[in-house]
Structure formats: C-alpha cells, structure tokens
Amino acid sequence: MDPKLEERARELRTLLQKASIAYYVHDAPILEDSVYDRLYRELQELERAYPELVTPDSPTQRVGEKPAEHFPTVFHRIPLYSLENAFNPEELEEWQERLLRVLGRAPVPDSRTEGELEYVCELKIDGAALALTYIEGLLERGATRGDGQAGEDITPNVRAIRSIPLRLATADPPPVLEVRGEVYLALAEFERINQERRSAGDPPFANPRNCAAGTLRQLDSRVVAARKLSFFAYALHWPEGWPAGDPPQTQWQCLQQLKELGFPVNPLSQVCRGLGEVIQFYERWRGAQLPYASDGVVVKLNSLRLQEEAGFTQKFPRWAIALKYPAQEVPTRIRAIVASVGRTGAVTPVAELEPVPLAGTLVSRASLHNADRLRELDVHIGDTAIVRKAGEIIPEVVGILKELRPADAVPYSLPSQCPECHTPLVRPPGEAVTRCPNPECPAKLRGQLQHWASRDALDIEGLGEKRAAQLVESLGVRTVADLYRLTPEQLQGLEGMGSRSSQKLVQAIQRSRQQPWERVLYGLGIPHVGVVTAQILAGHFPTPELLAQASAETIAQIYGIGAEVAEAVVAWFAEPAHRRLLQELQALGIPALPQQENPAVSQILAGKKFVITGTLPTLSRQQAKAWIESRGGKVTASVSRQTDYVVVGSDPGSKLEQAQQLGIPLLTEAELLALDPTVESGDLHP
C-alpha cells in the first residue's frame, strides 16, 4: 500500500468529519456542498479501490448496501424515562413546590419572580427519542426508546443520519458514553417527502413526528439517508467514569460538552433563574415560527447534584417537566355517542365525530370521560363539540357550542346496563368511573386477553383485538388460563385462521409459558401495577405466593411503591376468582420460576445511597447494583455528600479519591455483603 494513499484517505476523512461538525453543530459551513460532494466521492473511490483503507468512522460507512431483516431488542443501560406534563404556569408552580419539598427546601414566596432554583429550558422537539452508545469514542449502538427499559437496535439507520457523529470529537473519550437526543424531520424536508409521495400516488405522512419515527424503523438504511433526518442531543451519561478533568456538574455544562464532542445541540436552550424566567422563555417561543415542530418547553433542574438528590418517580424524573403549549382545538359535530367497556369494566362514553384534522391526524372519535363530565357539558347527539388532544395524544371533548345546537339534538346519558352483557352498571362510592361488575363481561374478557398478550406482558404474537374477540365469542375463552388449552384444530374453525396460522398462534401461546414472573404480574392487570412496578414487586416477592401473603404495610415500605399501589395489590389477591386464576396458571407452569426460589429479601439498605467503582472480585457491576437495590438501597453514578457508601474494587477510578476527600465510608465486596446478616456464605442472589 502506497503511504501517500493512506495519508490522503486519512486527510479526507478528517476534513469531511470536520466539515460535518461545522455544518450540523455550529451552523457554520467550511465547505461548499459541491466541494464536499467531490471530496466525498474521492474518498469513496479510494476505499473502493483499496478496501483496507475503510475505517468504521469513515463518512462513507453511514449507509449500508443491504436492508436489515429485523431489529433486535436491546436493553438500555440507563433507562429512558418519560416526562411529566404541565399545561399551564400554575401546574408548573405546583411541580416546583413538590420539587422543593423533595429537596428539603423552603417554598419561595413568589416562585414566578424570585425563584432560587436554576433551570435549563430546552424546546421540546416533536420527534422520536434516540439512545446512542459510544465505546472508546466510536459509535457502538443506536436504539429507539421503546418502553424506556428496552428498545430496538437500529444502528445501521443511525449511522445514516449525517448530524450524528460516528466518532467523538475528542482525543480522550470516556470508556463508555451514553447520549440521549431527539431525531426529527425539518418542516421543509417533511414537505418535500410528502410532495414526492403524492407524485408517486402514495398517501402522505400525517405529521413530521410520524414520518421521523417510521423512517427510523425502515429496514433499508438507504431510505433513512434519503429522508435527511436531523438530530438534537440533550443528555449524556458516563457510567464507567470520566476521562481526565472534572465531569460536567450542570445540565448546561452537559449541553456544552455535547457540542464539544461533535453533537448538534438546540441553540435556543437557555439557563433560567426561577420560574419567572422559565415562563418568559415559554411565552417567547410559544407559537413561534421554527424550522421544526415543537410542542412545548422542557424544564430541567440545572444542578446534576440536585437532580440526583431529587431522583425519580416510577415514571418520571422529579427534576424535569414538560410545559406543553396549549393544545390545538377544533369544532366538529357529534354523530353518535357509544359506551365503551374496558378490561377493568370501566365504562367510558365516546363521541363519534364527523372526521376532522387535529394535530396532524384525522380524528373521528373522542372521549367524554365519565357520567359527571357528560352532565357538566350537557352533551347532546348532534351538538357541535370543541375537540382537542389531551397531552397531544388522546382526543377529548372539552366544550359544547350550545348556540349551534340543532332543534333535533338528542340528550345523552350513560346507560344503566352494560352495553356488552346487560349487567346493571355500578358506580363505587367516591369514584367518578361507572363500572360493569360482571367478571364474565365479553368486553372485559377481550381486554384482559389483549393485555395479557401485549408486548410488555406475555408477548404473544398474533393475539390482537380481532383474535381476542373471536376467542371469547366463538371458543368460549373466559380467562387467560384458557388460552393454554387451545388446540390448532379449534382455531382453524375461526374466520381468517388456516392450518399454518393456527399452529403459529398455539406455538406463540405455549412459548409464553417461559415468561418470567414480573411479566406475568404485569399481565394480570392489577390496578396501578405498570411495567416498572411489576419489576420492583417481582424482585421483592419472587413467587406469586409470597406476594399474595404480603400485607399492604409491607408492600408500601418498598422503595418506589406507595400506599395506593400496595392496597390495590392486596385487594386484587383477596378476590377468590383471582386466586383461582393463579392456581390454574401455576398448574400450567406459569410463571416460569427458578428451581430454587429465593426467600423474600430484607430491606436493610432502605434509603442508603451507594456508588460502585473498580472491578469487584466475584460480582459484576450489574449484579452488585441488583443486590443493593433488592434490599432497598440506591446506586448512583457519582459521589456526592449524600452518598452513604462507596464500594471499591480493583483499579478504582476518581470516585475513590472523591470519597476519601468527602470522608465517605469505603466498602470491599465482602463488607458490602456483610451489611445484610441474613446472607449466607456463597449466597450472592439479589
């Protein structure tokens, strides 16, 4: 190989990477497009002639030649949480009051003008969340958000997004860097794509967000490259330590660090002192003409130390909130009202509407919530209703234009009997929801089957809404346990089911027997028990029997579980029908449990904060983390004055020195395990 060719390829890679950062990050192009294209083509031809010159971070390696067959599921090392929403300044102030209580600070007299907390305000980009992982400075993986715990590995498509660096712009990268951001489609690019689709006779995309999310899941990365997605980074994590120098201490420093590493960061972000400045920022950008879709402002506590102190709820970080712009509202006529019965028996009045475009989608149905809301609005069939999207997701009726009510409009109230099974409906004292009490109600059974088969529960492919209805109505399925007695011959009698599809569904059902207890627990549909809560409960009560025997007081003491959840769990297990269902499932080998069950774990570390540094003798970092958390402790990424213990292994990082400076107790692995006197030698199970 001619050294001059190697040098030329290296020069071209460096210049093209530098040009990409200048264009996408700093909005200050250093090369004309035509010059960039010519240099890119030269590098491409060099690599084609001499394949040994190709490197993983070469700009030519962004787009693959062959479409992927599927996207594997990957688990996020650091979960991607949702954000709590506020829809007006008053709700924002309530959020700050809760935050101040968590931080142990006195309320601010006038939080709009004299707020003492410092925040970073970032525009909420209407796109798709993305998790990026860099190992030793090179892009290792890009994944969708998924459910926050696990997403899809879409690395080939991520490499096709020009604004995402393949190599970090630093000579001293962290060993592992996790970057979070939003993939979006510029409005001009969205219009161009839709114009092409119309010309080709294809239906246009409803909105830029749908187009961006759909593009990320294209199996052919060449399609992704052609659609010119954009990216804004907004968070970074360094789970295995920071290189030389001090790591960022604030969210604002994180944003600046992201820019230095080569990521595009929204230039409109701003540090705000108190809620007064936050609301000014919100008012400034509400309704502004931007080159991309934005549906609000994300408000984050600036101090990373205070973020860690505030922590998380089961769903959201306590230190951040999305202040949403007012929802778009449109008028349309109510054609009819139907009562919809959900899997818990809740009866919801739903307005059937003349279809109307709203927030990028065509809306034909909207919720009326409950009987109280019906009376409050005085809803008539034939009325002109004001419809909006609640949190930009679920359409709801928020008002009636009574001045436009026609003479033949018909008043509506909820029926006294279930529309599905004709059982008299009940409204428990103190509740706004009207329910069908019949456990055999077909609508409830259909909903329960769908929930059991959902991706986060037993994940039974092929068991959707239509198939669940057929199983209930034609085959007499009454509980989820009945699913495991179905045969291919029975299914072949259903409309749309042939020999092969029947066999596949039965196989999918039988495979689900191997799902762990936490998924089964979520699939049972216990009120207030979502995916994360089910994981926490299953970690503390590793068998159904242990959870069924637990008192509400015991459950409520678990970190992350409140009294409301505890009472709902105890009430569910108290029902004889539910106990019978569990017995049936266990007779079928569901859930799949380890041969030797672990006893319930004590909460001896409740409230204690730990940091782990270095390599432990026998436990991996994840095993040690699970061991601590299963006993009520919390593992954090950085050392602070709130840290109770630092667990030290071989080759510790700078965290050891920080702990020594702060006088924080140090533990070996053996000393850590000795904190729980119930652990016998060799028992390292969480």
Curated annotation (Swiss-Prot):
NAD(+) binds at residues 33-37, 82-83, 122, 145, 182, 300, 324. Zn(2+) binds at residues 418, 421, 436, 441. This is DNA ligase. It is an enzyme of class 6 (ligase). GO terms for molecular function: DNA binding; DNA ligase (NAD+) activity; metal ion binding. Belongs to the NAD-dependent DNA ligase family. LigA subfamily. It comes from Synechococcus sp. (strain JA-2-3B'a(2-13)) (Cyanobacteria bacterium Yellowstone B-Prime). PANTHER family: CHROMOSOME TRANSMISSION FIDELITY FACTOR 18, DNA LIGASE. The lineage of its organism: Bacteria, Bacillati, Cyanobacteriota, Cyanophyceae, Synechococcales. It catalyses: NAD(+) + (deoxyribonucleotide)n-3'-hydroxyl + 5'-phospho-(deoxyribonucleotide)m = (deoxyribonucleotide)n+m + AMP + beta-nicotinamide D-nucleotide. Its EC number is 6.5.1.2. InterPro entries: BRCT_dom, BRCT_dom_sf, DisA/LigA_HHH, DNA_ligase, DNA_ligase_AS, DNA_ligase_CS, DNAligase_adenylation, DNAligase_N. Its cofactor is Mg(2+); Mn(2+). Disulfide bonds: none annotated. DNA ligase that catalyzes the formation of phosphodiester linkages between 5'-phosphoryl and 3'-hydroxyl groups in double-stranded DNA using NAD as a coenzyme and as the energy source for the reaction. It is essential for DNA replication and repair of damaged DNA. Pfam families: BRCT, DNA_ligase_aden, DNA_ligase_OB, DNA_ligase_ZBD, HHH_2, HHH_5, Nlig-Ia. Keywords: DNA damage, DNA repair, DNA replication, Ligase, Magnesium, Manganese, Metal-binding, NAD, Zinc. Residues 600-686 form the BRCT domain. One of its GO terms (cellular component) is cytosol. GO terms for biological process: DNA repair; DNA replication. The keyword Cell cycle does not apply.
